[in-house]
């Protein structure tokens, strides 16, 4: 198993920090090769937020203390909020690659809402190197702790949020475009066959 993790002040302690609007406390990545299983079980959740990005393979999540797993495939993100139970597993057979970040702050809920991250737990975000690059940049910043690293961490995480927001809007526009195209096709059909008996089922397949 490959791991590359970073922690604010080298501390793995769960924390809630209300001193700033957004604070990144830890981030990292896991890639399973030979280790059969990597489970996580936090019955009481955590005090902070956690965002996970499934970059490859898939992961098994148990939401709302459900024994039955929800399979989350590559190209999706999972968002845990404070005190939400966290139970999930990665399996080597799934060739799972995941990136994660924990964050807190005094304005996180409003910030997430402004980017379209509502009360859903699983978000489709698409695949590509952009997300991996941003997570890797956060890991490096938190490991090196150079001047201004806390601000850089916030900038990288906000870029992830912005990319998610753009993906949500482009997906919505795509769905709307498809719907408008179907409406146009139906109107054309009615105009061409106005003097004939109309079969609604036939129209739906034109």
Predicted regions and their residues:
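Amphipathic alpha-helical segments enriched in hydrophobic/aromatic residues interleaved with Lys/Arg
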Residues: 110-175, 188
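Ligand-binding loop in jelly-roll beta-barrel domains
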Residues: 83-107
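Conserved small/polar residues in nucleotide/adenosyl-binding loops
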Residues: 205-206
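Short helix/strand-capping hinge loops at secondary-structure junctions
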Residues: 193-197
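Generic protein-terminus/edge-of-domain signal
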Residues: 1-71, 92, 115, 119-122
